[in-house]
């Protein structure tokens, strides 16, 4: 089945449209061709989420489109990178996929967590496995370069898959939900749910004393290359604006494995990763068990002797000819255009979003800096609705687990662009770091700490104002 997808250039004039033709084979979509078309249609400036990286699309493929500003050669590399993103990794030797997975892992491919390039989902209850969620582990104190200290037997992430008959999985996690109600000022009742993590069938004994756990759903990949292109100076300017508004937003300071220096964090729920390359190679290593130049050793704590005894799938299981197109793919991902930006209700919701203080952290506009890896991403005006800073979100959202300078109550401001297409892309609208919020209203009501005043402003709004604010969020 062939499906054309249309992408929009920066100035809103669709003079060169890139159509990505996707071929579905065995239930998986692969990019098969790229075509150039001509059109004189226009899109209003208010709909341009990301300048020349904006695309006009409202389907399940909305998060997987190339930026229209790419060259023909870059589009070819994007196509190869998309195939790499879909690639299934297997334990060597096998004829069923690419060698290198494991010995322990949490999946077989990037799409296991980022289905259609979108967000993960939390399981409905303890009987359902964690398909696009994982559990972080650490013990009190700081590790190397100030990173969290891993559990000595299980590392910093529970690995739920091993090699049948050879390497046991580390254990399994179950999520239990408890529900409670919140009353809004006009009498409407909203049900919220709180997760509890249960770790079962631990293969290497009990967890270390003082163990800290945190459930994490995979974030969407919308515009990650543009966020990578935002300069440190722009992030520090965001922190200055935050202080001027009486907020305490601040950047995380983390270890840059690629450049071997301290750097500002920008990726991850606690902004604990400084750049997109490190984010990708870390995910390959920790989630799929795939080694690389930066992670040459298998992910096997010392007690896991069967894991350490497994032969590798190659010298580096993630070689540059495979990694480079995947990295280009991530850097060049486009951002869907806003929808209904001119609608009166949406515009009123935008005003309420600002007047209630939501934009104190969810800043609408950033500008990218010089970006050598993909020059087309340089000096773009973008509207991700994030400041890329850490904020104290209150005790109700605290996970009890610090990460570099991020405390237990601190979370990075999540980008909101593409939010309104989440249900279309992934079939759910689960939000926050562990997917506890099932829609935008629930997510807002979980906000505390620095966001408490904004939450209370929302709680006091009449229903029609709350609906307008949510309509604005759905337009992003």
Give the residues covered by each predicted segment.
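Secreted/extracellular small peptides and ectodomain modules produced from precursors
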Residues: 5, 20-23, 298, 305
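Periplasmic c-type cytochrome electron-transfer domains
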Residues: 32-476
